[in-house]
Amino acid sequence: MQKKRVGKSVVAALAIIAMSAGTVAAWADGAPRTNDFWWPERLDLSPLRQHDVESNPYGKDFDYAQAFNKLDIEAVKKDIRATLTTSQDWWPADYGNYGPFFIRMAWHGAGTYRTYDGRGGAGGAQQRFEPLNSWPDNANLDKARRLLWPIKKKYGENISWGDLMVLTGNVALESMGFQTFGFGGGREDDWQSDLVYWGAGTKFMSNNRDKNGKLEKPLAATQMGLIYVNPEGPNGNPDPVAAAKDIRDAFGRMAMNDEETLALIAGGHTFGKAHGAASPDKCVGAAPAGAGVEAQGLGWANKCGTGKGADTITSGLEGAWSVDPVHFTMQYLDNLLEHDWVLTKSPAGAHQWMPKDAQDIVPDAHDPSKRHPLMMFTTDIALKVDPAYSAIAKRFHAHPEEFKLAFAKAWFKLTHRDLGPKARYLGKDVPKVDLIWQDPLPVAGYQMIGDADIAELKRRILASGVPKAELIKTAWASAASFRATDYRGGANGARIRLAPENDWAVNDPASLSKVLKSLEGIQSGFNRNRTDGKQVSLADLIVLGGSAAVEDAARKAGYDVKVPFSPGRVDATQAQTDVASFAVLEPTADGFRNYYQKSNERSPAELMVDRASKLDLTVPEMTVLVGGLRALDANAGHSRLGVLTNRPGTLSNDFFVNLLDMSTQWTKSSSADGTYEGRDRKTGALKWTASPVDLVFGSSSELRAVAEVYASDDAHEKFVRDFVQAWTKVMNLDRFDLKRS
């Protein structure tokens, strides 16, 4: 299981216990105060300690892919179909079908994904945990998951909650007459809440915009506790024009263009209804996280009427978009475009819209003798008044088959966006077609190089005249573009030679171009006129070059080590690389290369931890990599900051030895912002310069404890071997083929 972690520092919640029957309260006395309570500005390393294997009850040797592949997926689908139309008295199905309810569950599970940092999404099934299980926009989805518990219980380890929720959404669509695009399994479950920055607000429904009125990065939802946008309009203001702007911003940050956005909303609102039988403020109790232990994880208890069925309260909006909410039809677009809509209010007092010539034509969800008018949200009307959305809606309305395909593909993208490349997909229902957002790779049509070839290629690379530091920087830049949050980036594909990566400032484009040109020459020379069918990709050669340089640096330190290398990477084409999609992977800070853009709002050290979490690193791995890369002179821009050694290019522990040397006194530079000077305590002579990232390994008590290990006299070999191990891990982060072989 890979880690999908944070943003900003997270203060641990106070422990809670049952104080008496039916009550849950925080300890008034005896609860431990976290260090963040006393020193909120301390560097938080918890992102690097989340989702460790000890929290997984299946154990470290559990192979989810293997378990999933034993699953009879058709049997699971059959059980889901039976559940859809088996209404339960404790939570009756609208129109006798839970399909729309399960679509909302799957949508909201996947819809937290955001492109800027790759966090959120269906993977991990985080909808089960706080805060998502108690977000206002997820009201009553606790019941949807409980309805699925008998199926999860039946199949156990063979299907994760993440896969089951998405699969259920698919089956629900199919059971109501819609043809989905496919399904890929592979979402391993998490066992604790992700540490994710969801916004600065301290109250639900607070605005997620910055002081300039722009939606804060990396967020996608416009208000705290929402998946996308406020259905009543921005901050509850029923302005369709403003709502269209919010929709475009929010869905765009979730990787959807205008056509995909329109297709998703129109397709999703074809089904089901909204629930606002009465005022939530007067009727609805605490969310699951705030409910008593006797509620057993359920929340939003409704004391009005029966509290369920016709009396259900979820969003406060009330009604359906069509007269047949449990079948796929074109009625949503028919109704949106053909009616004139006027503003009204739901029984709960929420802003919504009804036809100007409203008639009671919609069947009641529970009483066949009743009928109701159609309704639309402000965000639905936005699709009619916005020129771009309106044009797409009219085109889809005129061409139903085009709409069906667009919705099918958009739904597939929504529910699979955070699963990563197609190589991670499991099951027989995976579509054969490659989609550009999956970051496709070509299939190698040649034999892989062997040990003798690898040795010869390393010899040629080291003899090429390319500086060893540049080989290391290039390999690191290529591999460290990976992020474990959505499994994008990495060395496979050699996209560092393509736009936009080849022009990223952190990659030193001018130097990078020279290295790539040299490696391409070696590649061409090796591949030319081969008769044994073997070829080497540039992607493999980039990693091999860095590894050869690391081995050379280790030899200079007196250690003969072999950096593990597994060929098999391929070279993507520019046509397989969506420039706009890859642009969000560009780092504005990389502590491993001492790179930091001053436009960042968070500190260099915080962003280093965030970067390390995206590389799935532990605290010791992050520490040894920073120290090693400094010794190898691998900073961006050829910066000398943190190169605390008189023998750069030697894989030594000098960074830690010199950082912890008490003969050096550190002060802020008076001439260079963000720079610190290390001077001899006695003479005042300048010895070193460093960044805040460098110094935090001496100032943070937890990082210093690890740094002391690597600075010790007996740690020279340990440092080298730990660095090689961590380096290899980063080089192989996107080698999903190795992890399943």
UniProtKB/Swiss-Prot annotation:
PROSITE patterns in the record = PEROXIDASE_1, PEROXIDASE_2, PEROXIDASE_4
Which residues does the annotation say bind heme b? Answer: H269
Q: What are the recorded GO MF terms, alphabetically?
A: catalase activity; heme binding; metal ion binding
Transition state stabilizer (site feature) positions: R104
**Could you tell me at which residue positions the Tryptophyl-tyrosyl-methioninium (Trp-Tyr) (with M-254) crosslink is annotated in this chain?**
W107-Y228
Annotated disulfide bonds: none
Record PTM: Formation of the three residue Trp-Tyr-Met cross-link is important for the catalase, but not the peroxidase activity of the enzyme.
- Active site per database record: H108 (proton acceptor)
Q: Which residues cross the membrane?
A: none
UniProt GO cellular component terms? cytosol
Alphabetized UniProt keyword annotations: Heme, Hydrogen peroxide, Iron, Metal-binding, Oxidoreductase, Peroxidase, Signal
Q: Which reaction does it catalyse?
A: H2O2 + AH2 = A + 2 H2O; 2 H2O2 = O2 + 2 H2O
Q: What class of enzyme is it?
A: oxidoreductase
Give me the comment on cofactor binding. Answer: Binds 1 heme b (iron(II)-protoporphyrin IX) group per dimer.
Q: Where is this cross-link: Tryptophyl-tyrosyl-methioninium (Tyr-Met) (with W-107)?
A: Y228-M254
Which cofactor is essential here? heme b
Q: What does it do?
A: Bifunctional enzyme with both catalase and broad-spectrum peroxidase activity.
Q: Which family does it belong to?
A: Belongs to the peroxidase family. Peroxidase/catalase subfamily.
Protein name per the record: Catalase-peroxidase 2
